[in-house]
């Protein structure tokens, strides 16, 4: 089974890349195949709401979304990490989420995939829960199965994430829960 991690930060090598890496390491240790999307490396233009994707299986905007669509389609689970920018995730991740409407219009391509969210803020109560709830909203819109970390919403860290031992534990627990649910689904399919 495959888990795709999406680092929603426009900043390279920072906290989101570190927490998505930690989460995917848990998945690898459990035997999952992993893949990543680093929004900092991708060119994703905002949706124009042109409606062209209603009638075709591609977006008319020529950027990196075609590769991202394929990574999301190929995944059994998707874990998204986002920093808090003004109380929510950054515009670059919003563009990716908006453009994912193509996958919804094409028979709910993300339906029943398992999703989880991670967030990092500048302080312990820096908007991470709101950011995670917004990511969960996107997942629910796609009909995904959403999991948390067994305590609240998902993996919540503060800057610098790798020094936040409590936060990094929530990242690990969120990844474990994602893996647990995927394994349960697989066991049910194998019956």
From Swiss-Prot:
Keywords (A to Z) from UniProt: 4Fe-4S, Flavoprotein, FMN, Iron, Iron-sulfur, Metal-binding
Statement: the UniProt record of this protein carries the keyword Iron-sulfur: yes
Cofactor details (free text): Binds 1 FMN per subunit.
Gene3D superfamilies membership: 3.40.50.360
Transmembrane segments: none
Impact after mutating residue 50 to A: Formation of a 3Fe-4S cluster in place of the 4Fe-4S cluster
One Pfam family of this chain: FMN_red
Gene Ontology MF, one: 4 iron, 4 sulfur cluster binding
Effect noted on mutating residue 47 to S: Modified 4Fe-4S-cluster properties in electron paramagnetic resonance
Annotated residues for binding of [4Fe-4S] cluster: 47, 50, 53, 59
Keyword flag Ribonucleoprotein: no
Requisite cofactors: FMN; [4Fe-4S] cluster
Cysteine-cysteine disulfides: none
More details: The electrons derived from oxidation of the carbonyl group of acetate flow from ferredoxin to the 4Fe-4S cluster and then to the FMN cofactor.
Subunit structure: Homodimer.
Function: Redox-active protein probably involved in electron transport during fermentation of acetate to methane.
UniProt similarity note: Belongs to the SsuE family. Isf subfamily.
Protein name, as recorded: Iron-sulfur flavoprotein
Organism: Methanosarcina thermophila
High-level lineage: Archaea, Methanobacteriati, Methanobacteriota, Stenosarchaea group, Methanomicrobia
Underlying gene: isf
């Amino acid at each position: 089974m495959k888990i795709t991690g999406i680092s929603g930060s426009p900043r390279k090598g920072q906290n989101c890349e570190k927490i998505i890496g930690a989460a995917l390491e848990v998945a690898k240790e459990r035997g999952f195949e992993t893949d990543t999307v680093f929004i900092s490396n991708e060119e994703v233009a905002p949706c124009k709401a042109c409606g062209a994707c209603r009638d075709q299986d591609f977006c008319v905007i020529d950027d990196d979304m075609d590769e991202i669509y394929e990574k999301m389609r190929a995944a059994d689970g998707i874990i998204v990490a986002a920093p808090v920018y003004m109380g929510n995730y950054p515009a670059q991740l919003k563009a990716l989420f908006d453009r994912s409407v193509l996958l919804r219009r094409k028979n709910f391509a993300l339906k029943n995939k398992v999703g989880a969210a991670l967030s990092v803020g500048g302080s312990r109560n820096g908007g991470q829960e709101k950011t995670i709830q917004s990511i969960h909203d996107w997942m629910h819109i796609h009909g995904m199965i959403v999991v948390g970390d067994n305590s609240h919403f998902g993996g919540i860290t503060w800057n610098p994430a790798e020094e936040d031992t409590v936060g990094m534990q929530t990242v690990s627990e969120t990844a474990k829960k994602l893996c647990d649910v995927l394994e349960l689904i697989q066991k049910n399919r194998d019956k």
